[in-house]
C-alpha cells in the first residue's frame, strides 16, 4: 500500500511540475509576443516604412538571431490561425465567395 501511494505522490508531483513548466513557458511566450510585436513594428518602421508585412516574412530568410526566431514563430502561428479561419469559411454552403478568394 505504502509503495503505491508513494508512486502516486511521485506521479502527481511530476504532473504538477510539468504543468507549471508548461504554464511558465506559455506565459513567457505570451509576454514575448507583446514585446516582440512592438520591437518588430519599431524595427520594421525603421527599415521599410510601408511594407512591414513583407519585411516580416523575409525576416527568417535573411538573418535569424534567436530573438528574431520567436518573431517568425509568432507570424507562422498567426498564419495558422488565418488558415483555420479560411478553411472554416470554405465549408460547403458557407460562403463560396471567400473560398474563391482564398484559392486564387
From Swiss-Prot:
Free-text tissue specificity from the UniProt record: Expressed in lateral root primordia and in lateral roots excluding the meristem region.
Compositionally biased region (Basic residues): 41-62
Region (Disordered): 37-104
One BP term from GO: regulation of root development
Processing and modification events after translation: The mature small signaling peptide is generated by proteolytic processing of the longer precursor.
Top-rank lineage group of the source organism: Eukaryota
Keywords from the UniProt entry: Apoplast, Developmental protein, Hormone, Hydroxylation, Secreted, Signal
Positions of the pro-segment in this chain: 28-85, 101-104
Hydroxyproline modification, residue list: 92, 96
GO molecular function, one term: hormone activity
Signal peptide boundaries: 1-27
GO-annotated cellular components: apoplast; extracellular region
Keyword Secreted carried by entry: yes
Keyword Secreted among UniProt keywords: yes
Role noted for this protein: Extracellular signaling peptide that may regulate primary root growth rate and systemic nitrogen (N)-demand signaling. Mediates up-regulation of genes involved in N uptake and assimilation pathways.
Subunit (UniProt): Interacts with CEP receptors (e.g. CEPR1 and CEPR2).
Family: Belongs to the C-terminally encoded plant signaling peptide (CEP) family.
Record's protein name: Precursor of CEP11
Amino acid at each position: 500500500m505504502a509503495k503505491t501511494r508513494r508512486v502516486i505522490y511521485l506521479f502527481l508531483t511530476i504532473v504538477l511540475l510539468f504543468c507549471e513548466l508548461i504554464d511558465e513557458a506559455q506565459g513567457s511566450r505570451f509576454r514575448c509576443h507583446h514585446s516582440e510585436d512592438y520591437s518588430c513594428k519599431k524595427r520594421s518602421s525603421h527599415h521599410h516604412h510601408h511594407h512591414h508585412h513583407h519585411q516580416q516574412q523575409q525576416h527568417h530568410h535573411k538573418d535569424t538571431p534567436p530573438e528574431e526566431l520567436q518573431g517568425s514563430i509568432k507570424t507562422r502561428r498567426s498564419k495558422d490561425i488565418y488558415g483555420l479561419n479560411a478553411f472554416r469559411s470554405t465549408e460547403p454552403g458557407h460562403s463560396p465567395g471567400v473560398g474563391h478568394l482564398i484559392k486564387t
